[in-house]
From Swiss-Prot:
UniProt organism field: Chlamydia muridarum (strain MoPn / Nigg)
Keyword Repeat: yes
A biological-process GO annotation: chromosome condensation
Protein's name in the database: Histone H1-like protein HC2
Residue windows of the Sequence repeats: 35-58, 71-94, 113-136
Keywords carried by this UniProt record: DNA-binding, Repeat
Biased composition range(s): Basic residues: 1-50, 59-72
Region span, Disordered: 1-72
Function: Might have a role in establishing the nucleoid structure of elementary bodies.
Transport listed as a keyword: no
Amino acid sequence: MLGVQKKRSTRKTAARKTVVRKPAAKKTAAKKASVRKVAAKKTVARKTVAKKAVAARKPAAKKTAAKKAPVRKVAAKKTVARKTVAKKAVAARKTVAKKSVAARKTAAKKAPVRKVAAKKTVARKTVAKKAVAARKPAAKRTVSTKKTAVAAKAGVCMKKHKHTAACGRVAASGVKVCASSAKRRTHHNRSRTAHSWRQQLMKLVAK
C-alpha cells in the first residue's frame, strides 16, 4: 500500500438511538353551537277600510215599440171577356178496305241425300322382317395391374390411364408421358388433389 495507512480514531461513536416521532396531538376545537337570533315579530295593526256601499243598479226600462199590422192592398181584378172560337167540323175518316193476304205456300223441304263414298279395300303388303344377327358380347379386356404392362404396348405413353390417340402421337415423338385429358384409372370415390397428381407424375418421370 502506498503511504501510511490512516489510523482509525479510537473514539467510539455513541450508538444512535432511533428517534421515534410522536404524532402531534390533534386539538379538537370545541364547536360552538351557532345561536340563531329570532327576529322579533312586529305586530302590524291592520286598518279596516270602510266599504263603500255600491248603489243598486236599476234595470233600464225597455221601450215596447208598438207594432203596426202591415196592411195588404188587394189588387183590383180585371174581368177579361173571352171570345168563343168557332169549332171546325172534322171530316169523317173513311175506313180503308184491308187487302186479303194471299195464302203462303209452304215449300216442301227436300231431305238432302248423302252419298256414301265407296270404301276402297287397300291390300296391305306384309314386309318381310329381316333377321337381325345376334350380337356377340364383346370380349372384356383384362387390365393387368402390373406397371410394366402399360409400358409394354408400343406407341403408348407411360401414364396409367385409358390411352387415346393423343397418347400414340406423344409416344411416337419420343416423350414418355403425355399431357392428354384422358380418364384416369381411379376409383370413383377417390378425390384427387393437385399435390397427389404432382407426386404421381414425378414417380412416372423418374422411371
